[in-house]
Amino acid sequence: GFVSITMVAVLGFGFTQIDKFGIIRAKGIIIEDENGRDRILIGSPIPFSKDRVRTDTTLVRQYWAKQFKNPDQYMEWYKKYKNSAEGIVFMNEKGFDVVQVGDNLSDANIGKRMFRSTGILWNTQTGWERGGAGVNTTKDGKSRPTIGLDDDAGEALHLICLEDGSKGIVIGGENGSLRIGMAKKEGELFQNKGKFSGIQYFDNKGNLIWEQNMDSATKNKQ
């Protein structure tokens, strides 16, 4: 009767075959929030988003250009900045990039990158870059892993390993930078001729003001 039919129906639904997909191929994916705004862009390169501030020059002028003495000059510079990325871009509800993960990541909104950036970048809620971690690759194919933290003034604290063997911590400030680390002869980071293990202070023009080299101190004691 009715009970038998119901049981058959329940058992039938219980053993219904479920389709599974092992691979999904797509040129790009846009994930929206509950209000229909684009929030996550996935692709290689990432797809265009109508809600993204970085690709809307009207919003760029409104939010960022006004922070500079010459907004028109900033907009001219901005035309040359790279806004694309190969990976994932997370945006907040106002359309600002807050996190990027992947390869060939976007330029900062204050200047072009000198290297191809692979890794992760994070920004403030209004799109100003505040740090990142990953590998920077030069045009000639050399790679250098870095971890960086920025503040309102620019580069604040960076952990760097260069391809010439130099490795160190760079603390930047308004008047110059403090560099702590080690390097082989002719190191780029510490501008050293011989081996270096110690600390240096450079002014904001790149001139060496003071240093303490442990390698030199050790040689003098021998």
Model region roles, listed by residue range:
Residues 17-222:
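Parallel beta-helix/beta-solenoid repeats that form elongated, surface-exposed shafts/blades used
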Residues 1-18:
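Single-pass membrane-anchoring alpha-helices
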